[in-house]
Amino acid sequence: HTEVRRQRQMCIRDSSYHDYRFSISMLGRQMGKSTTAAGYLLWYAMFNADQTILIAAHKYSGAQEIMHRIRHAYELCPDHIRAGVTSYNKGSLEFDNGSRIIAQATTENTGRGLSISLLYCDEFAFVRPNIAKEFWTSISPTLATGGKAIITSTPNLDDDQFAMIWSGANKKIDEYGNEKETGINGFKPFKAIWDEHPDRNP
């Protein structure tokens, strides 16, 4: 039953990634957020042509870990759905449909010059506040032209960039007093605390 519950939670999270252009998730540690995101990013790249997917992780080691999970998932894919690969490196993966996945540590210059179709920020609350602010300021105009964004993190500070986006995502009353499905910043918020993990003891 715990495995079924875990799979159901992952499906719900995948649905949140897919159904909303912008989503932000506040999640406890060991909740499967990186693994779930890796699966979704791989699917998105293989089944949507000419996409540039950027992984911006808290640290370079985190970016590499997500890419490792993506490569592992790719190798496990059945032949009939596995897209051809034209470049297979530690920091990037390029497919024969023109899509690519790039993994980098988050700096103020990450993603600069790229036309990003899908941005995934991992453990965004733990990026140094000044860097996170500069990064978000520089990357936001790119997303405004039609890109998707997925942000996941465990919470850290009350006034960092992650907290600001989370706060905006939870303000769902517009200027006319109507309740919206997404926040005033366009983000859909999702939250799961540590004791909701099916393997945790109550």
Which residues fall in each region the model found?
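Single conserved hydrophobic/aromatic residue that forms the stacking wall/gate
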Residues: 1-8, 12-14
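Walker A/P-loop
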Residues: 19-41
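Conserved Walker A/P-loop ATP-binding site and its immediately adjacent core
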Residues: 50-72
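Inter-Walker segment of RecA-like/P-loop motor cores
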Residues: 65-117
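Conserved P-loop NTPase catalytic core
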Residues: 99, 155-202
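Short, conserved "post-DEAD/DEAH" coupling segment immediately C-terminal to helicase motif II
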Residues: 129-146
